[in-house]
């Protein structure tokens, strides 16, 4: 869903392990790394989209995680001009609802090949703040906002 301003509705997932390290995935056939994320389909709530993306991208089901928190606001970022879709509807960026999850199941349940079009080639656990300086530059500010917002929920 792309709104009138050109922003695609999207959910992003920060998945914690027991040591409060976060899941960090390498995009398929690319050198870039990021958190799991994906679009909100028409008629879908952000929570429903989050669970769908969680399964599509890393193979986890609702029973494998605990939802700790979600952002109140949608965080927006613009994409570089070279990535802007010029066909209707024009997409200039994404607005994201963020979710903080805790992994309850063994990490062996993480399955990057859970669907026919995997999003990630590789993954690892990284320290909580690591992603801010290692995600693609145009996402850094939304990562900073989300991780700062969630910090109060981490024991």
Curated annotation (Swiss-Prot):
Q: What is this protein called?
A: RNA pyrophosphohydrolase
Listed PANTHER family: NUDIX HYDROLASE 26, CHLOROPLASTIC, UDP/ADP-SUGAR PYROPHOSPHATASE
Please state every residue range assigned to the domain named Nudix hydrolase: 6-148
The record's listing under Pfam families reads:
NUDIX (PF00293)
Which parts of the chain are coiled coil?
none
Question: Which cofactors does the annotated protein need, by name?
Answer: a divalent metal cation
Family in the record: Belongs to the Nudix hydrolase family. RppH subfamily.
Gene of this entry = rppH
Task: Report the residue ranges where the short sequence motif Nudix box is annotated in this entry.
Answer: 38-59
The source's domain of life comes to Bacteria
In short, the EC number is 3.6.1.-
GO process annotations (BP): nucleoside phosphate metabolic process; ribose phosphate metabolic process
Q: Provide the species name.
A: Francisella tularensis subsp. mediasiatica (strain FSC147)
């Amino acid at each position: 869903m792309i709104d009138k301003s050109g922003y695609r509705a999207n959910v992003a997932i920060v998945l914690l392990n027991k040591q409060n390290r976060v899941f960090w995935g390498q995009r398929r056939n690319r050198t870039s790394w990021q958190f799991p994320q994906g679009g909100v389909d028409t008629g879908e709530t952000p929570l429903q989209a989050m669970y769908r993306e969680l399964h599509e991208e890393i193979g986890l089901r609702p029973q494998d995680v605990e939802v700790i928190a979600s952002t109140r606001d949608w965080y927006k970022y613009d994409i570089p001009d070279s990535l802007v879709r010029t066909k209707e509807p024009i997409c200039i960026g994404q607005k994201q609802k963020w979710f903080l999850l805790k992994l309850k199941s063994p990490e062996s349940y993480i399955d990057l090949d859970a669907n026919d079009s995997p999003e990630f080639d590789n993954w690892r656990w990284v320290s909580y703040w690591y992603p801010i300086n290692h995600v693609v530059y145009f996402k850094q500010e939304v990562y900073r906002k989300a991780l700062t917002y969630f910090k109060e929920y981490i024991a």
